[in-house]
């Protein structure tokens, strides 16, 4: 249990997708203007990461990797791990499509607010990175579930904090040359420096 808790904390704070690895920054900067929209997208990312990382773990273990379980049962040794990227993106696209249909039907206001950025979750590098890190680190199915939740929560936390800061900055006297994305990049950098303080924690 302690191992899973350590993995969860590590994936949220120490290895934060947005502020440690700088993944998913296009969506991170574009949707962090309002805190309500940021929380909505952050929740969507948590759901997608929580589902896709363990699903892709099963896909990798049972089908893709060298001497996978399926091929062992068939008595052949096949390595189709080179299809990993296409397979992972396919799983992510399917999950995002289901989520998009769900939001369109049950939460239309959030669906309209997210607009084009919801289908763009499919090609959000932070989402794909979750599955790639899972394979690289050879996580078990249980570890994949924990890592999926943690990496999604970490990204959602980062975008929610950024949105809160940007809403406050509307009332700040920002220099003319730094208005808009200029001050946003500086803020993201300062937040990343803050998250660097977690890197000294040994778990």
From Swiss-Prot:
Pfam families: Rnf-Nqr. Keywords: Cell inner membrane, Cell membrane, Ion transport, Membrane, NAD, Sodium, Sodium transport, Translocase, Transmembrane, Transmembrane helix, Transport, Ubiquinone. One of its GO terms (biological process) is respiratory electron transport chain. It is found in: Cell inner membrane. GO terms for molecular function: oxidoreductase activity, acting on NAD(P)H, quinone or similar compound as acceptor. Its EC number is 7.2.1.1. It is a multi-pass membrane protein. It catalyses: a ubiquinone + n Na(+)(in) + NADH + H(+) = a ubiquinol + n Na(+)(out) + NAD(+). GO terms for cellular component: Gram-negative-bacterium-type cell wall; plasma membrane. Coiled coil: none annotated. The keyword Zinc does not apply. The chain crosses the membrane at residues 11-31, 35-55, 82-102, 115-135, 145-165, 181-201. It is an enzyme of class 7 (translocase). Composed of six subunits; NqrA, NqrB, NqrC, NqrD, NqrE and NqrF. NQR complex catalyzes the reduction of ubiquinone-1 to ubiquinol by two successive reactions, coupled with the transport of Na(+) ions from the cytoplasm to the periplasm. NqrA to NqrE are probably involved in the second step, the conversion of ubisemiquinone to ubiquinol. Belongs to the NqrDE/RnfAE family. PANTHER family: INTEGRAL MEMBRANE PROTEIN OF SOXR-REDUCING COMPLEX (PTHR30335), NA(+)-TRANSLOCATING NADH-QUINONE REDUCTASE SUBUNIT E (PTHR30335:SF1). This is Na(+)-translocating NADH-quinone reductase subunit E. It comes from Dichelobacter nodosus (strain VCS1703A).
């Amino acid at each position: 249990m302690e191992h899973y808790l350590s993995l969860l904390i590590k994936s949220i704070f120490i290895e934060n997708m947005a502020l440690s690895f700088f993944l998913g920054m296009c969506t991170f900067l574009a949707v962090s203007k309002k805190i309500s929209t940021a929380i909505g997208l952050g929740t969507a990312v948590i759901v997608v990461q929580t589902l896709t990382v363990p699903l892709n773990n099963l896909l990798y273990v049972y089908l893709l990797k060298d001497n996978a379980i399926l091929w062992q049962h068939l008595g052949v040794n096949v390595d189709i791990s080179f299809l990993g990227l296409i397979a992972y993106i396919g799983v992510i696209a399917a999950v995002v499509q289901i989520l998009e249909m769900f939001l369109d039907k049950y939460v239309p206001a959030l669906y309209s607010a997210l607009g084009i950025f919801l289908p763009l979750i499919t090609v959000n590098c932070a989402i794909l990175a979750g599955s790639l890190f899972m394979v690289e680190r050879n996580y078990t199915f249980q570890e994949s579930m924990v890592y999926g939740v943690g990496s999604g929560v970490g990204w959602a936390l980062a975008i929610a904090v950024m949105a809160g800061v940007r809403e406050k900055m509307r009332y700040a006297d920002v220099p003319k040359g730094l208005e808009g994305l200029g001050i946003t990049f500086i803020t993201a950098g300062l937040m990343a420096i803050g998250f660097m303080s977690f890197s000294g924690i040994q778990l």
